[in-house]
Amino acid sequence: MVVIVDTISNPLRPRHPEKVNRPDSASPPKPDWIRVRAPNTRGYADTRNIVRANGLHTVCEEAGCPNIGECWDKKHATFMIMGDTCTRACAFCNVKTGLPNALDADEPQNVAEAVAKLGLAHVVITSVDRDDLADGGAEHFAQTIRAIRAACPSTTIEILTPDFLRKEGALEVVVAARPDVFNHNLETVPSRYLTVRPGARYFHSIRLLQRVKELDASIFTKSGIMVGLGEERHEVQQVMDDLRSADVDFLTIGQYLQPTRKHHAVMRYVPPDEFSSYEKVAYTKGFLMVSASPLTRSSHHAGEDFARLKAARAAHAR
């Protein structure tokens, strides 16, 4: 069977076989405000070497993040645990789909060692969806959090989780490990779920974020969406309201970028001034923090944003 090949990784490997028979989806040319420089700095190379030496995966590489050069130059990386293969096939995502391998029992400790080597004050841990596991990987998340706490007590920990759909008790396991920030992305507006995120349920994700606050109100909650997928402005504003009803603290909004022609097309490149408008509206709805720009991604500037988030909570409490 013909497969889409990841031409970045070495050796080349099959990727997105489920998308092979889809027709190509053409996107408009990228505007100037989207373009970024290719990564080639010493800091970038050092970060890559540490990731490789510890046998780890990062969402920076797997998802083709446009900010990888900037972040890795500063030795900031978002570690992706539980392998590099996802059990879902979202139309926007560049992470490969298939049957994942068994969990690596050494991974939590390997991640903790990499965090120590990079000297991270704030680390972001995400994962693929693991619908094949009874708990969706919740205990592995918890073990990773605990390993980082033991190795780097002063490092703050942000997690970006899957939705643990139909995994009873999984969320409670993760929250009990007490990450500093719990992020779960809605990704898009409800009307686009069928074509963009068919394996997920919008209101399940809203409820998951709300439940985190019910379990531990001290944990910051965060969520993000992409724009440029065919949504309307009023739908984005409704997402803001839904997230605030779940007491979510931090909202990110970024431009969707098409990984390959087999993925969902970019319907529109949203101009920077429209992102600024979204940010202003979101603040009026009560979010402690909002980041909205074409290149905003969940983990971009996460450390700096965490410091600002704490300051905003303290100011709000006064």
Swiss-Prot record:
Claim: Iron is one of the keywords in the record:
yes
Q: Where does [4Fe-4S] cluster 1 bind?
A: C60, C65, C71, S299
Residues forming the Radical SAM core domain are: 72-288
Q: Where does it live in the cell?
A: Cytoplasm
Reactions performed catalytically: [[Fe-S] cluster scaffold protein carrying a second [4Fe-4S](2+) cluster] + N(6)-octanoyl-L-lysyl-[protein] + 2 oxidized [2Fe-2S]-[ferredoxin] + 2 S-adenosyl-L-methionine + 4 H(+) = [[Fe-S] cluster scaffold protein] + N(6)-[(R)-dihydrolipoyl]-L-lysyl-[protein] + 4 Fe(3+) + 2 hydrogen sulfide + 2 5'-deoxyadenosine + 2 L-methionine + 2 reduced [2Fe-2S]-[ferredoxin]
UniProt EC number: 2.8.1.8
Q: Where is this region: Disordered?
A: 6-32
Binding positions for [4Fe-4S] cluster 2? C86, C90, C93
Name the cofactor(s): [4Fe-4S] cluster
Q: In which pathway does it act?
A: Protein modification; protein lipoylation via endogenous pathway; protein N(6)-(lipoyl)lysine from octanoyl-[acyl-carrier-protein]: step 2/2
Provide the alphabetized UniProt keywords: 4Fe-4S, Cytoplasm, Iron, Iron-sulfur, Metal-binding, S-adenosyl-L-methionine, Transferase
Q: What class of enzyme is it?
A: transferase
How the cofactor is bound: the record states: Binds 2 [4Fe-4S] clusters per subunit. One cluster is coordinated with 3 cysteines and an exchangeable S-adenosyl-L-methionine.
Matching HAMAP family: Lipoyl_synth
Family designation: Belongs to the radical SAM superfamily. Lipoyl synthase family.
Give the protein's recorded name: Lipoyl synthase 1
Species the sequence originates in: Bradyrhizobium diazoefficiens (strain JCM 10833 / BCRC 13528 / IAM 13628 / NBRC 14792 / USDA 110)
